[in-house]
Swiss-Prot record:
Site feature location: Important for activity and substrate specificity: 327
One Pfam family here: MR_MLE_C
Organism: Escherichia coli O6:H1 (strain CFT073 / ATCC 700928 / UPEC)
Gene Ontology molecular function: magnesium ion binding; mannonate dehydratase activity
Record protein name field: D-galactonate dehydratase family member RspA
Family of this protein: Belongs to the mandelate racemase/muconate lactonizing enzyme family. GalD subfamily.
Function: Has low D-mannonate dehydratase activity (in vitro), suggesting that this is not a physiological substrate and that it has no significant role in D-mannonate degradation in vivo. Has no detectable activity with a panel of 70 other acid sugars (in vitro).
Length: 415
């Protein structure tokens, strides 16, 4: 009898699950779950260039099956939507599950009246080290941008740069002083040209210039964005060892995890991989064979708090640390959740922080703070993030796509 009563009292029935697609500068997909006692939770389901697919997956399939369930039963709901779909994994399915999971953790932490990081096990550090993006169309521009971010207090800085002889290069803003936004609005992706030879010849010159001017005080990061073959990546990693990079990111497409062994055999430059992964299975071989140093999976794409916690725990056995993807195409809801996760997770490495426009942050009033290179999620119960539905409605969805890349002879390549 007592047991039944206790179960009944702990039941927090879900009465509403709503999906919002809004474009305050770029598209975001937000899930809002409401319980019968009025507690709400938010989850991010944004999948850049495929937002409507995740929105319909949630609206048509998951939201109706959430109604009447106990919001406290996060693990059971996660398993139900993962195993119950029969078709497991994949970016659309996992982004939808991630949003549900994030919203339920928001609710649970609010019900417990504590910030999410406390519910996860409390802070493991004073603050969350974040890295910023710096770019320039020339080395001098990149150095100026680096200096600006250094003055802001960033301890970890990613550098990208325009390459002589190439009209387009990954990581460039559309114009001087503009924030970098990879997606282009319209019905068709932008096509960009790529030359591995020009990249391999030029990029070490950028790192040399940065280290010569600024020294080794900051962690230096660089994103290769899946562009190189394994042997090219091995050669590149070897050639930049003197610059003591914090990591080289996504050196080669990671579907073939075996090929990272070849890179490892040739260079001690640390490797970070995983922003396009959507489950622990994508990470398994890379982690257990110690072929990478940082795992970049995200809360929005890899199963929410529940999925990411498994990945991080597994990675900790092999001294692989987290370095979660954090561009502005994951919404402020994901960033809020990520900062709670990062503050708690024992094997934390670094968190990417690209930042958001004022317009975006008006739609998603946030509670996190930045101080001298470190962020903190704040002490509000739950994720500490809100969603202004009325304002969001003023920014309807606009089709936008990430670019595609072609080699100079026209061959479609990895963007």
């Amino acid at each position: 009898m007592h047991h039944d009563k206790r179960c009944k009292e702990s039941n927090m029935k879900i009465v509403k699950a709503e999906v919002f697609v809004t474009c305050p500068g770029r598209n975001f997909v937000t899930l809002k779950i409401t319980t019968e006692d009025g507690i709400t939770g938010l989850g991010d389901a944004t999948l850049n260039g495929r937002e409507l697919s995740v929105a319909s997956y949630l609206q048509d399939h998951l939201c109706p099956q959430l109604i009447g369930r106990d919001a406290h039963r996060i693990e059971d709901i996660w398993q139900f939507f993962y195993k119950g779909a029969y078709w497991r994994r994949g970016p659309v399915t996992m982004s939808a599950i991630s949003a549900v999971d994030m919203a339920l953790w928001d609710i649970k932490a609010k019900a417990a009246n504590m910030p999410l990081y406390q519910l996860l096990g409390g802070a493991s550090r004073e603050g969350v080290m974040v890295y910023c993006h710096t770019t320039g169309h020339s080395i001098d521009e990149a150095l100026d941008d680096y200096a600006r971010h250094q003055e802001l207090g960033f301890k970890a800085i990613r550098v990208q740069c325009g390459i002589p002889g190439m009209k387009t290069t990954y990581g460039m803003s559309k114009g001087k002083g503009l924030a970098y936004e990879p997606a282009t609005k319209g019905q068709w992706p932008e096509e960009q040209l790529w030359s591995t030879e020009k990249y391999l010849d030029f990029m070490p010159k950028l790192f040399d210039a940065v280290r010569n001017k600024f020294g080794f005080d900051e962690h230096l990061l660089h994103d290769m964005h899946h562009r190189l073959t394994p042997i090219e990546a091995a050669r590149f990693g070897k050639s930049i060892e003197d610059y003591r990079m914090f990591w080289m990111e996504d050196p080669t497409p990671a579907e073939n995890q075996e090929c990272f062994r070849l890179i490892r055999q040739h260079t001690v430059t640390p490797i970070a991989v995983g922003e396009v992964f959507n489950s622990i299975w994508d990470c398994k071989q890379l982690i257990e064979e110690q072929l990478i140093d940082y795992i970049r999976t995200t809360l929005t794409h890899a199963g929410g708090i529940t999925g990411m916690r498994r990945i991080a725990d597994f990675a900790s056995l092999y001294q692989v640390r987290t370095g979660s993807h954090g561009p502005s195409d994951l919404s402020p809801v994901c960033m809020a959740a990520a900062l709670h996760f990062d503050l708690w997770v024992p094997n934390f490495g670094v968190q990417e922080y690209m930042g958001y426009s004022e317009q975006m942050l008006e739609v998603f009033p946030h509670n996190w703070t930045f101080d001298n290179g470190y962020m903190h999620p704040g002490e509000k119960p739950g994720l500490g993030i809100e969603f202004d539905e009325k304002l969001a409605a003023k920014y309807p969805y606009e089709p936008a796509y990430l670019p595609v890349a072609r080699l100079e002879d026209g061959t479609l390549w990895n963007w």
